[in-house]
Amino acid sequence: MRKKTVLLRGPVLTRSGYGEQARFALRSLRSREDLFDIYIHPLQWGQTGWLSETNSERLWIDQKIEKTISYIQNGGTFDISVQVTIPNEWENMALTNIGYTAGIETTKVAPDWIQKANEMTKVILVSNHSKNVFENTKYDGYIENVNPTTQEVERTPTQLETTVEMHAVNYPVKIYEDLEPLEMDLATPYNFACVAQFGPRKNLVNTIKWFIEEFHDDADVGLVVKTNVAKNCLVDREACEGRLRGIISEFPDKKCKVYLMHGDMTDKEMHALYVNEKITAALSLTHGEGFGLPLFEAAYTGVPVVATAWSGQLDFLCDEEGKENFYAVSFDLNPVSEEAVWDGVILKDSMWAFPRPQSAKSKMRECIDDAKSGKTEKYCQIASQLMERFSEEKMYKQFVDAMDVEDGFDVESWLDDLQIEEVE
């Protein structure tokens, strides 16, 4: 049977959430090279940096990119496109078009996203939250037509909603056999790790403030903030340091510590952060997540998680029966802040979670108290369950199954395989 030509279009070489998503899609396709002839069209992703490490996967990607350029220049076409980007950038590029997106961190998607989704053959999302928001967003409207007899404009009520087949496929775990703890000079024995970009959605300013307010007089507790504004360069670090100093300057007598971590880190180094014995828990008071990859990495590494109890992270912070396996911070759903509005993406009339300050402080304190009394050992067992539930093999298969391209009658392959003999 002829392999299907697949074009993966996405920010596969960038250090970004969508970059990680594109690499997962690529690895899923690569797990079935018996089915797919893979081509790659790399995209930039905002101001985020590009991957710096060179390994066998990077060399393979570079070869595929060169192959793609040559193939397109010679008029090659594709059976399938997998487009890893926000929906308003999806296009009709192949016979079968699959949109793959993180979806949305709020309660509503834009009308353009629904229209673009309905133009796809299938849509794959990273979490059930994103899938549910797509499926539950509806817009009432009218179709206007001119009556040929009266020449009057007639308006017929209609509803814009998602009609395309949609699937939620989570990320897989990553396993490092020789993982050594990341070396960090931490003066405090108990520390939260917060991996978050400086921006409205991650709620980082309040996270830092509420941490300091709760542990103001506790010299044993620290907060490690791994962050950036856009890139991992020196100018960006200086900007982050300035913002951080501005926040902590409001608390001149604090005894707790706040540490800034900045710069390029490999996936392995990020995992090594969580196995440092002084990292007690992961902390995220986010307004919303498509999935929440840093929290996922912490959870399957065996680190307790303190997080907002809403959006994409619930796919892995809750078990398959819905039981919460984390320190769940209460929240209220309210309209997104004005500074977060992004035309065509984050809508002014959409909502996301606003963690309650007292609940956040209470859960942080509860987590530290549990760690001091040895009550967090259960998270190693939970991590083992996550490793099984989200194994690479299972997630790659789920992604390929969601594409649903194995079945069906391939006319071209059938013609190629025909045995035709001349009869005299």
What annotation goes with each model-predicted range?
Residues L7-R9, T48-V133:
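Extended catalytic core of nucleotide-activated donor transferases of GT-like folds
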Residues K122-D178:
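Donor nucleotide-sugar binding/catalytic pocket of nucleotide-sugar-dependent glycosyltransferases
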Residues L234-L273, T280-A281:
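Nucleotide-activated donor-binding/catalytic signature segment of Leloir-type glycosyltransferases, i.e.
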Residues M351-S359, D369-D401:
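A charged, aromatic-enriched C-terminal amphipathic alpha-helix characteristic of glycosyltransferases
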